[in-house]
């Protein structure tokens, strides 16, 4: 492996405006149909992944995530459409040309695929041997890889002596052996416990920063996307239903699929017993229910106290949470604006002027919601 770039070199490589807009992977109108499937597994998927991004692709089981990532390096050949990686149309290649192109695309999997009969160093050496590198060159290049993934002290260990996280580190080192510019991660943390998952995500983030590596991360776990991805695409029934900066998708999800993934992570959705009490329109004795999204410094402002002191509102908090996406705070608060009445337009205008995103999501008879909310707790 080449020497790691300095921070200045890495900044020039992935930080400039011109380069950061460069598309490393372009997926154009991609479709895939299997002979035994009722319909297309992928249906007219288009996606652009830029240099240095960690791009998450999330979806339910069967959404087509793994098929999509396997089409990027042509482990699965698409039925229609194009995949372009680093300026080369991968889908037009076969034989030796395809094998050479794949050297620029590393891949790790949910199951670690380490050979039990080989040591850690022996497993990492495999891509070098397939590429025909001399033995001395292989011996020179293995130690920096093991150092990068935190396994320098395990070079002579066998897989039976390793934890699951250490086996995945072997997989990462092996995937990076031929200096790829792209790393595909297909459910790479799904078989790991939460603590080990966090460690592997931290390693991937570190590798992304040090090497300027573009990472495509397939997962069904939104917290993985929250913790590491710069952008995210939401896949459902073989189609991209939403795509954007991770913070924007988490803060302002547009699709029902994204909102369902966020239900345990960001408080966009009310608990079902409370949601069941909401009315679609105002009735006598009801109050508006507001969902307020806080971002940046507004996530820490005393908004509820402000509503009481400025407008005399009697707020009843139904649900809320503050989380962090990267280093940016994101809060979602749902409350009944008790006594808002004719003051509601002024309340909404005031909250908007503070940089908050606010919407009326329904109405509620306060006493009924309070009773049900108390029971739900």
Curated annotation (Swiss-Prot):
Ranges for domain ABC transporter: 25-262
EC supergroup of this enzyme: translocase
Keywords: Amino-acid transport, ATP-binding, Cell inner membrane, Cell membrane, Membrane, Nucleotide-binding, Translocase, Transport
Binding site for ATP: 59-66
Top-level taxon in the UniProt lineage: Bacteria
GO cellular component, one term: plasma membrane
Catalytic activity: L-methionine(out) + ATP + H2O = L-methionine(in) + ADP + phosphate + H(+); D-methionine(out) + ATP + H2O = D-methionine(in) + ADP + phosphate + H(+)
SMART domains reported in the protein's UniProt record: AAA, NIL
One Pfam short name: ABC_tran
Entry coiled-coil feature ranges: none
InterPro entries for the chain: AAA+_ATPase, ABC_transporter-like_ATP-bd, ABC_transporter-like_CS, ACT-like_dom_sf, MetN_ABC, MetN_ABC_transporter-like, NIL_domain, P-loop_NTPase
GO molecular function: ABC-type D-methionine transporter activity; ATP binding; ATP hydrolysis activity
EC nos: 7.4.2.11
Mode of membrane association: Peripheral membrane protein
Localisation per UniProt entry: Cell inner membrane
Function as written in the Swiss-Prot or TrEMBL entry: Part of the ABC transporter complex MetNIQ involved in methionine import. Responsible for energy coupling to the transport system.
Family (UniProt): Belongs to the ABC transporter superfamily. Methionine importer (TC 3.A.1.24) family.
Subunit-level organization: The complex is composed of two ATP-binding proteins (MetN), two transmembrane proteins (MetI) and a solute-binding protein (MetQ).
Matching PANTHER family: AMINO ACID IMPORT ATP-BINDING PROTEIN, METHIONINE IMPORT ATP-BINDING PROTEIN METN
Designated name of the protein: Methionine import ATP-binding protein MetN 2
Organism: Rhodopseudomonas palustris (strain ATCC BAA-98 / CGA009)
């Amino acid at each position: 492996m080449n020497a790691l770039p300095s921070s200045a070199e890495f900044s020039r490589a992935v930080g400039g405006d011109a380069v950061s807009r460069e598309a490393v992977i372009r997926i154009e109108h991609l479709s895939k149909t299997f002979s035994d499937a009722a319909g297309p597994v992928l249906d007219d998927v288009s996606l652009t992944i830029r240099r240095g991004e960690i791009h998450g692709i999330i979806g339910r089981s069967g959404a087509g995530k793994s098929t999509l990532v396997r089409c990027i390096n042509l482990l699965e050949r698409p039925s229609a459409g194009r995949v372009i990686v680093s300026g080369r149309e991968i889908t037009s290649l076969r034989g030796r040309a395809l094998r050479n192109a794949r050297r620029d695309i590393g891949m790790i999997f949910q199951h670690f695929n380490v050979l039990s009969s080989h040591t850690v160093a022996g497993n990492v050496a495999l891509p070098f041997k397939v590429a025909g590198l001399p033995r001395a060159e292989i011996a020179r290049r293995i130690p920096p890889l093991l150092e990068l993934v935190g396994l320098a002290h395990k070079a002579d260990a066998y897989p039976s002596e390793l934890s699951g996280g250490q086996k995945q580190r072997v997989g990462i080192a092996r995937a990076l052996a031929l200096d790829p510019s792209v790393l595909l991660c297909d459910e790479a943390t799904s078989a790991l416990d939460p603590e080990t998952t966090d460690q592997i995500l931290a390693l991937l983030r570190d590798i992304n920063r040090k090497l300027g590596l573009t990472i495509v991360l397939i997962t069904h776990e939104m917290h993985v996307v929250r913790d590491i991805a710069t952008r995210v695409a939401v896949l459902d029934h073989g189609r991209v239903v939403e795509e954007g900066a991770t913070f924007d998708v988490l803060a302002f999800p547009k699709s029902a699929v994204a909102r369902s993934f966020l239900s345990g992570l960001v408080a966009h959705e009310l608990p079902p017993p409370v949601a069941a009490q909401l009315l679609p329109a105002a009735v006598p004795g009801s109050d508006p229910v507001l969902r307020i999204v806080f971002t940046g410094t507004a996530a820490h402002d005393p908004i509820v106290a402000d509503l009481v002191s400025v407008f005399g509102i009697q707020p009843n908090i139904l649900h809320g949470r503050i989380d962090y996406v990267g280093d940016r705070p994101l809060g979602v608060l749902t409350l009944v604006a008790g006594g808002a009445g004719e003051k509601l337009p002024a309340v909404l205008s005031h909250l908007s002027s503070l940089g908050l995103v606010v919407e009326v999501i329904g109405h509620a008879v306060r006493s009924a919601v309070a009773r049900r909310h108390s029971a739900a707790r």
